[in-house]
């Protein structure tokens, strides 16, 4: 068995920073799949990525010449020869397909019969000729939404590929990938005089890049170095860096030869609101702000250069100038915004389109105002304060700062509202209206914020359904699924007693003053929410059977649904709960066989067996005991009480003949079972739990 080190490096033009990790991981996984498919063994694989290269280093790859055994079974002997002993057409076709004559075939015999059979060993394609094909396949199978095309052959990848290295120990593996011939010349740093670095042995990778031009090919080592460097620099000026993994990941994907540099800016810019200042430094300039021990910003930031140079001062001065210009713009936008109060911008929303066929942001604001007023009746929020928050909710969208920094919407609204002496809860709601922004994100903390978030999301959902922008199986351009999950989470986790049916109807009514399509739209929205609710519970860890058992009962009150799902999950964990479930299954099967609908009242006088009287008494006792429990939605207590039916049901089936010769007694016993089924199905459809 011959084992060697295989190196593959793909030199590219600058890859998108936000996609680098995804692309490199896909390349790594796809390559492993290809190796497994071709039965090529190896010890381990390590992957590398920088803005201008993707690489794989495969240790102890087995390049031993290999054979594959081919087995092909033909027609049975009976069907292979005719009565005169000549080959049939079926046998002739099979021999031709295998490329053999009858003398090369053998007979396979077992207890089931006898067949023509062909077995041979075929030499597999040489691994050296396979590797370039495997590499190209692994690259082409990377899922990328937006690709670039280049060259006469119209090749396609995230960015044009310019260089290929395939090295097996010291040997260059000949072959083309994307019509580029492999060689032993690595792509050098963009700033280097020499465009390539010669590599003699695969084992020297990635050390040779670091030694020749300070290139750190390992993404994770590069990331750790950046973190360590910025923390050390911040400590030198008695500051610290707040953890921002998104920025760290982005910067790591932007550089391959990182050098952290401390840069200062004028202290006057510290008067700009903190969120604007941070956003300018982090989002616009991809730099790291520095904080003091009191968590206040210092007039410094750290820039990660992509070049190792003795002339760092020039880079620092250049970044000072750029940052000064950016902060000056931010200062101007902020001062310009503060010339007028936030509320005075309300009418300006008339000029801003919310969505085609759905009017302006001003009209959306008025709908939100009416909807939050209705929602406030079901929550602990003040109605007037809720209305005030609704009227101010979109005003910051026409400010200069938000136009320049869209990601600050809501945050700037809150800041300006506080500056205008609005109530704190009203101001806070302006930021909280956009929560949750993604799966697992925090929820609004204030009652007004919860109401505003629900109203805003519900208005958008209703509007999009109204104009037909409904998510398909694979497309959701307006992120309506996320909005629906946001509404569901707020209602459930904040325990707001909102009826989903009423909420949807109220929201639709604000778009549509009575229309025949109202009912169709309503049904579509209910179905949409129920699907989202099912998936959310499933992702949360609840059993699909339990979720279906509750949702199939058509309850629209989310809190009620939530309590039932929790209760059924609790019940399923109880000892012997399965015996109750199987009893319900038996009852359901008996009732399902009845062709005519079972109607009428149970008549105790028709009960002649002790077991049916005991069961009836248990039902009456259950009804009396659980009357208030149902009103209070204490489903755990109800299900514990349901367990008390276990023995009476068992004894009933053991001692009582349901199909009595007297039709009245038979009907009475079926009514008893029907009553039992209704008790169980009042909480959930237990048929999903069988």
Curated annotation (Swiss-Prot):
Major subcellular location class: cytoplasm
UniProt KW Cell cycle keyword: no
GO MF assignments: arginine-tRNA ligase activity; ATP binding; glycine-tRNA ligase activity
SUPFAM superfamilies per UniProt: HD-domain/PDEase-like (SSF109604)
PROSITE patterns on file: AA_TRNA_LIGASE_II_GLYAB
Record GO biological process: arginyl-tRNA aminoacylation; glycyl-tRNA aminoacylation
Alphabetic keyword roster: Aminoacyl-tRNA synthetase, ATP-binding, Cytoplasm, Ligase, Nucleotide-binding, Protein biosynthesis
Signal peptide per UniProt: none
EC identifiers of the protein: 6.1.1.14
Highest taxon of source: Bacteria
Chemical reaction(s) catalysed: tRNA(Gly) + glycine + ATP = glycyl-tRNA(Gly) + AMP + diphosphate
Class in the EC hierarchy, top level: ligase
Transmembrane region(s): none
Subcellular localization(s) per the UniProt record: Cytoplasm
Quaternary structure (record): Tetramer of two alpha and two beta subunits.
NCBIfam families xrefs: glyS
Protein name (record): Glycine--tRNA ligase beta subunit
Naturally occurring in which organism (per UniProt): Buchnera aphidicola subsp. Acyrthosiphon pisum (strain APS) (Acyrthosiphon pisum symbiotic bacterium)
Underlying gene: glyS
């Amino acid at each position: 068995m011959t084992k060697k080190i295989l190196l593959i490096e793909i030199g590219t033009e600058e890859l998108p920073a936000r996609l680098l990790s995804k692309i490199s991981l896909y390349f790594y996984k796809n390559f492993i799949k290809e190796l497994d498919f071709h039965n090529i063994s190896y010890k381990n694989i390590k992957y590398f990525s920088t803005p201008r290269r993707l690489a794989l280093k495969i240790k102890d790859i087995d390049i031993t010449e290999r054979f594959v055994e081919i087995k092909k079974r033909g027609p049975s002997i009976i069907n292979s020869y005719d009565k005169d002993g000549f080959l049939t057409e079926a046998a002739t076709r099979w021999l031709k397909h295998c490329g053999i004559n009858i003398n090369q075939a053998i007979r396979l015999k077992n207890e089931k019969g006898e067949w023509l059979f062909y077995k041979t060993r075929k030499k597999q394609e040489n691994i050296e000729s396979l590797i370039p094909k495997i590499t190209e396949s692994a690259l082409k199978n990377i899922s990328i939404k937006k690709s670039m095309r280049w060259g006469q052959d119209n090749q396609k990848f995230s960015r044009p590929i310019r260089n290929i290295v395939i090295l097996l120990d010291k040997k260059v593996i000949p072959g083309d990938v994307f019509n580029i011939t492999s060689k032993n010349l690595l792509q050098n740093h963009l700033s280097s005089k020499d465009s390539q670095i010669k590599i003699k042995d695969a084992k020297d990778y990635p050390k040779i890049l670091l030694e020749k031009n300070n290139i750190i090919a390992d993404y994770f080592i590069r990331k750790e170095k950046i973190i360590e460097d910025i923390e050390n620099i911040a400590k030198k000026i008695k500051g610290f860096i707040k953890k921002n993994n998104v920025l760290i990941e982005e910067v790591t994907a932007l550089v391959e030869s990182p050098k952290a540099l401390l840069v200062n800016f004028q202290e006057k810019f510290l008067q700009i609101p903190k969120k604007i200042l941070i956003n300018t430094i982090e989002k616009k300039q991809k730099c790291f702000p520095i904080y003091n021990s009191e968590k206040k910003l210092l007039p410094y930031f750290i820039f990660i250069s992509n070049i190792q140079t003795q002339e760092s001062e020039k880079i620092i001065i250049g970044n000072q100038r750029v940052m000064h210009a950016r902060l000056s713009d931010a200062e101007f936008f902020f001062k310009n915004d503060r010339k007028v109060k936030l509320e005075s911008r309300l009418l300006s929303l008339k000029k801003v389109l919310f969505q085609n066929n759905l009017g302006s942001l001003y009209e959306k604001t008025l709908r939100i105002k009416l909807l939050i007023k209705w929602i406030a009746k079901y929550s602990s929020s003040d109605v007037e304060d809720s209305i005030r928050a609704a009227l101010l909710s979109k005003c910051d969208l026409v400010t200069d700062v938000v136009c320049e920094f869209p990601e600050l919407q809501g945050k700037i609204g809150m800041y300006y509202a506080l500056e205008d002496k609005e109530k704190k809860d009203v101001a806070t709601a302006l930021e909280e209206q956009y929560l949750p922004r993604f799966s697992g994100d925090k929820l609004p903390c204030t009652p007004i914020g919860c109401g505003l978030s629900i109203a805003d999301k519900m208005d958008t959902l209703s509007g999009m359904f109204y104009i037909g922008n409904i998510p398909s199986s694979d497309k959701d351009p307006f992120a309506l699924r996320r909005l629906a999950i946001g509404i569901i989470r707020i209602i459930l986790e904040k325990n707001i007693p909102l009826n989903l049916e009423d909420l949807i109807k109220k929201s639709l009514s604000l778009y549509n003053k009575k229309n025949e399509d109202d009912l169709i739209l309503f049904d579509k929205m209910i179905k949409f929410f129920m699907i989202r609710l099912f998936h959310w519970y499933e992702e949360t860890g609840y059993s699909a059977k339990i979720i279906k058992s509750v949702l199939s009962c058509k309850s629209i009150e989310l809190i009620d649904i939530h309590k039932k799902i929790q209760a059924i999950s609790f019940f399923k964990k109880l000892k012997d709960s399965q015996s109750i479930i199987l009893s319900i299954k038996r009852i359901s099967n008996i009732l399902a066989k009845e062709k005519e609908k079972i109607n009428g009242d149970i008549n105790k006088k028709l009960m002649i067996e002790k077991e049916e009287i005991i069961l009836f008494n248990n039902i009456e006792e259950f009804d009396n005991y659980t009357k208030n429990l149902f009103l209070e939605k204490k489903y755990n207590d109800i299900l514990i009480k349901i367990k008390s039916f276990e023995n009476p049901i068992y004894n009933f089936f053991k001692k009582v003949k349901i199909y009595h010769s007297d039709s009245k007694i038979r009907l009475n016993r079926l009514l008893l079972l029907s009553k039992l089924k209704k008790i169980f199905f009042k909480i959930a459809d237990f048929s999903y739990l069988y």
